């Protein structure tokens, strides 16, 4: 790939993925924020054993650079365990909306707000590869179509199981629901504690970051936004 060239098509609508040759499964993302790059497709096509071996070798090198002995008893299995853990923490790269939704969209004559709050999420900051942990609150106002409630949590999990920044994660969840249901609007609020602010840097335990992403009527109507924030018990 040429330096600076994107692996996705950043069209005006930003809804068209770049074609990936040899793709065995569609990987769906939104808004050009996390389109699968060539490395993502390689991950999907590479055998699990090979991925674990490559990551394990890299971790052994890191341990040596830290002044440790990867061959000592306490660390003998650490590189392989870490490799398997990282593949699990980032399994969202191998998931897509079609599989996550699994046709759980239903016709329903309901046009009032639907909210699922306090969804626990765990992700990895893409800047330091350390965790951020928090909760997501999701609301939407249907337009004759509703989504199975568990699917809202599964969408949040799919995007959180990638290397992320909180702002992008919040926006991706909102845009995914908007794309799937085409409702009157979607509201997503996320609160999280970032270990990169707790364990290093400013070292401020107890601090939290709040982000939001609003579409449709939640953007246009102050009253609707206010109702959502009141119902999730925030602000």
From Swiss-Prot:
The keyword Cell division does not apply. The keyword Magnesium does not apply. One of its GO terms (cellular component) is nucleus. Its EC number is 3.5.4.16. Signal peptide: none annotated. It catalyses: GTP + H2O = 7,8-dihydroneopterin 3'-triphosphate + formate + H(+). GO terms for biological process: folic acid biosynthetic process; tetrahydrobiopterin biosynthetic process; tetrahydrofolate biosynthetic process. GTP shows a positive allosteric effect, and tetrahydrobiopterin inhibits the enzyme activity. Residues 1-27 are annotated as: Disordered. The modification Phosphothreonine is found at residue 25. Zn(2+) binds at residues 125, 128, 196. Keywords: Allosteric enzyme, Folate biosynthesis, GTP-binding, Hydrolase, Metal-binding, Nucleotide-binding, Phosphoprotein, Zinc. Pathway: Cofactor biosynthesis; 7,8-dihydroneopterin triphosphate biosynthesis; 7,8-dihydroneopterin triphosphate from GTP: step 1/1. Residues 18-27 have a biased composition (Polar residues). PROSITE patterns: GTP_CYCLOHYDROL_1_1 (PS00859), GTP_CYCLOHYDROL_1_2 (PS00860). GO terms for molecular function: GTP binding; GTP cyclohydrolase I activity; zinc ion binding. GTP cyclohydrolase 1 is the first enzyme in the biosynthetic pathway leading to folic acid. Belongs to the GTP cyclohydrolase I family. This is GTP cyclohydrolase 1.
């Amino acid at each position: 790939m040429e330096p600076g060239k994107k692996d996705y098509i950043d069209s005006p609508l930003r809804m068209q993925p770049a074609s990936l040759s040899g793709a065995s499964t569609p990987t769906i993302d939104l808004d050009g924020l996390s389109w699968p790059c060539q490395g993502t497709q390689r991950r999907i096509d590479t055998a699990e054993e090979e991925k674990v071996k490559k990551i394990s070798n890299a971790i052994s090198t890191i341990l040596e650079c830290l002044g440790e002995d990867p061959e000592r008893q306490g660390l003998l299995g650490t590189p392989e365990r870490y490799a398997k853990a990282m593949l699990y923490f980032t399994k969202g790269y191998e998931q897509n909306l079609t599989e996550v939704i699994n046709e759980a969209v239903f016709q329903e004559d309901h046009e009032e707000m639907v909210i699922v709050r306090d969804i626990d999420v765990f992700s990895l900051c893409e800047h330091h590869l350390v965790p951020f942990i928090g909760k997501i609150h999701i609301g939407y106002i249907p337009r004759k179509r509703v989504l199975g409630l568990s699917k809202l949590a599964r969408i949040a999990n799919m995007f959180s199981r990638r290397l992320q920044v909180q702002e992008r994660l919040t926006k991706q969840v909102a845009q995914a629901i908007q794309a799937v249901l085409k409702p009157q609007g979607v509201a997503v609020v996320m609160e999280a504690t970032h270990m990169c602010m707790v364990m290093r840097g400013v070292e401020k335990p107890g601090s939290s970051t709040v982000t939001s992403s609003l579409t449709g009527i939640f953007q246009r109507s102050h009253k609707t936004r206010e109702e959502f924030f009141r119902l999730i018990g925030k602000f």
